[in-house]
Amino acid sequence: MLLLWLLLLLLLLVPLLAILWQQRSRGARPCWLISLQHRVAWGMLGWAAAWQQWRLDRSTLNVGQSQQQALMWCLKKAQGSCCLPREDTDMRTFRNHLPLTQTSHTQEQESEETLPSPASPQYHGDASLQATLLGLITLNKAYPEALAPGSTACVTPTSPWPCSVPWLGHALGRVSPDGAKDPRTLLLEALISPGLRVLEARTAVELLDVFVGLEADGEELAEAIAAGILGTLLPKRAAELKEALEQGPRGLARRLWPKLQVVVTLDSGGQAEAVAALRVLWCQGLAFFSPAYAASGGVVALNLWPERPQGSYLLPPGVPFIELLPIKEGTQEEAASTLLLTDAQREKEYELVLTNHTSLTRCRLGDVVQVVGTYNQCPVVRFTCRLGQTLNVRGEVTDETVFSVALAQAVGQWPGAKLLDHVCVESRVLDSCEGSAPHYEVFVELRGLRNLSEENRDKLDNCLQEASAQYKSLRFRGSVGPAKVHLVRPGSFRVLREALAAFSSSSCRPPEMPRVIRLRHLAQLLQKRVIS
């Protein structure tokens, strides 16, 4: 108990010290003070992380009891009226009184009468705090020098760490401490710091936008650095930036920051494509780490294994309360009843169902996971697809994974092409099927290819037929027309993401990237930027 009180006292004192130290310029602080600040911060962080690790281990050793406690907590804290008794509610009563409901599968919906998400990121709940504290400790163990003072920079206004700890960035001596800043200023701060070991961005797609923008505005940024826009004239660093950019995108991050070890982004739906592009081009040779997986209900899974490249996540038994809805093998139909975490079976696929006290609703997220292992009694999963990102023009179901694999195979047959981004639109959205069979309209942004031949366009349709027997049958009968591929100019998807953010009714939505667009004005936004 005494140790807990000491920890709480430190938690109160360090933010105050960080604010006081922040008032002094970076150059005015003596080295011993910076070192002391860093040691105190890591001491606190280690204590807090050890406490969270103990709580996580205890809860995952008795998952049934932990989930029952989480459910009781949600019922007690539920806002407004509740149709359930607050005490002694078993799972059968819970399921009978609260039917499953749908939540938004993407950031844009045709109907505005959608149910609210059960929680709002950035991000509430034990899972968010655990993801941040345990993620930092895990990252430091994997890369011991990565979080030394001045070794980390975030190039987006929002951090990838789910739980915002205002003093942490200052206490750990980050180049870009937490707090809303202009993205250009954040990038400049990172560029003038050649000793970076960790590069952070909220999501992979946002980091992709940063690198595309860096290439486009590199000359202007170099001039700003040389002119000392951040307070110090740095002509040598400006020359290094120009030289690095002249060598092209492949390996650019390592040329800018020779000591760089790892890229930290927050994983969510639709990020895998951006990660793949970053790995092949700008961030070649670097490790990637995501502390958590964020969905419509906030943080739903923790990453305790930075060494695993596939992205394995632990489903914790706390709040939000998680149920698993089995997916029937070979289809995207769901079973009649949900399961608890203890009932999950290895290699099986499930849709996540979340309940939180904010909105006492059993929300089907649409995020599908496959169980790949266990941590104590809790399932370790891999996120496979989102049910809301399926294509269907004639009753077929082409899910996100099937389409992405087919597209990757097709792009692999386009000489010199690297896929940066894509979205699909069903032809009815653009009224482009008049006089022809309904089909898929596919918009892609590429690197290394400026024009698409008809032969290359046809390869996507061939790959789709190989990937889906149902699609092949419909194509053979003429019920579905060939997929049409459109190449858009660089930066088009950044414009799309800005439009999605403006269209979103809440700034707290998770940073998902839709792969199927169902609103005409968003599809037309890309249509206007087609170059081939």
Swiss-Prot record:
InterPro entries for this protein: GH3, GH3_C, GH3_M, GH3_N
Pfam families: GH3_C, GH3_M, GH3_N_vert
Organism annotation: Mus musculus
The organism's taxonomic lineage, starting at the top: Eukaryota, Metazoa, Chordata, Craniata, Vertebrata
Subcellular location: Endoplasmic reticulum; Nucleus envelope
Superkingdom of the source species: Eukaryota
Glycan-linked positions: N356, N451
UniProt key word Cell membrane: no
Expressing tissues: Highly expressed in mammary tissues from mature virgins and at day 13 of pregnancy, and at lower level during lactation. Expressed at intermediate level in liver. Expressed at lower level in kidney, heart and brain.
Protein name as annotated: GH3 domain-containing protein
One cellular component (GO) term of this entry: endoplasmic reticulum
Keywords from the UniProt entry: Endoplasmic reticulum, Glycoprotein, Nucleus, Signal
